Amino acid sequence: MSVEVEYLQHEDYLYRTSKLKEIRDLGINPYPYQYTDCLEVQEIRNQFVDNELGDSEAAFRKETPKVRFAGRLVLFRSMGKNAFGQILDNDAKIQVMFNRDFSAVAGLAADAGISPIKFIEKKLDLGDILGLEGYLFFTHSGELTVLVETVTLLCKSLISLPDKHAGLADKEIRYRKRWADLISSEDVRKTFLTRSRILKLIREYMDQQSFLEVETPILQTVYGGAEATPFVTTLQALHAEMFLRISLEIALKKLLVGGMSRVYEIGKVFRNEGIDRTHNPEFTMIEAYAAYWDYNDVMKCVENLVEYIVRALNNGETQVQYSHLKSGPQVVDFKAPWIRMTMKESISVYGGVDVDLHADHELRKILETQTSLPEKTYVHASRGELIALLFDELVCDKLIAPHHITDHPLETTPLCKTLRSGDETLVERFESFCLGKELCNAYSELNDPLQQRKLLEEQMRKKALNPDSEYHPIDEEFLEALCQGMPPAGGFGIGIDRLVMMLTDAASIRDVLFFPVMRRIEAKKD
């Protein structure tokens, strides 16, 4: 029983493999080992911007600068004794000109029976990767061009490029075949180059604030730091059950105990839960913790960090347009300070409900009549849980401008200090929202080991009553570390994928992940 791989039967693949054989028969290696001492195309474009560089006649006389570079052939047209192509390298393109009497093919023997220009026209295809040496000139229309002296085939492409105008129209194919998507779409390349720059800017800012970047384990014996379902695996060497981390928090707090006063980590986190427009089971976070801070200090850090990134990406501007809200395009200003309000205030302002004027049964009635939540989610909920549900249902998607929503109910987290005012029903937690989505979660971190144990044990009791709940097991090593003594601290976590979505005008988290999780396609079998 053989497995059919569709592209192997495609006419274009068969045609290109026949060319591959012909190229080898000519004594040319279509997959050489290296091609060094190259400039990048963007470097060439940056260095040579003066259109008085010289015309093609000067290039033919070899009087203009000579360059050596490599890239993928993405356009080609033959015009008599000349042929023109376009080379793509990273996100930059440059025009090249091949000439019947000037251009040579590396490795092509003089008695091969085919001229260099015919080899270029007949044996090369769009998608091939080429090394090129030649002389720069400007065309009459001002186009920077390279008159190619020598072309070296570096990789023969056996699959045709996506249509240059339509690109990959099917989104699922784009996500599955990201390599082709990157080749065909300038916008997609720009998105991922911006993602890379955002990561660089985050590190730049955190380093400026004297944070130390660290690495902590992805495989853990106890998972914690968030309410989420973990991925479970087995470590064969120890015959032990292990978990992929659902958060970076616990390990970073242990480093605070060890005397590292400001730490952060950028890394992958895994949650075995749903997939939708803003959620992927594998995602990237930054978590950071600073000794002697509280959540007020963290608020300033978060909004200044995001403003720093936005200004760097937008030539000093703080406004960003986002096009994918149901209400239509919105312009968001990330300039600090952001709007701050308590969770109760936000429910009053955006949901029209003053929770302090309503008893628990009245809050349940509001959830019943104004939301589509199933009754089981709120029928036995505590008052704090009811308030959190009202916020989720009535407020979140209305927070378009950047907001810090502060002072959450105690029930929402066991890892945070209660309000210093003495109200033990609320905690010093804030979540940052923008464009209707959560961007950041942050606390004045709980460092009282006895109170921490009490809250975690309360979670375990709730788990015993509801086996389907997401409450995580107690990490005794973490509690031992707290007993050693953790300084007062503030900490935050930001979902980097979601931040990139907001800053690149992406409709889906899949648009900012090179390889998002996709349903497996079963291969066709005979």
From Swiss-Prot:
It catalyses: tRNA(Lys) + L-lysine + ATP = L-lysyl-tRNA(Lys) + AMP + diphosphate. GO terms for biological process: lysyl-tRNA aminoacylation. Binds 3 Mg(2+) ions per subunit. GO terms for molecular function: ATP binding; lysine-tRNA ligase activity; magnesium ion binding; tRNA binding. Its cofactor is Mg(2+). It holds the Pfam family tRNA-synt_2. It is an enzyme of class 6 (ligase). Its EC number is 6.1.1.6. Homodimer. This is Lysine--tRNA ligase.
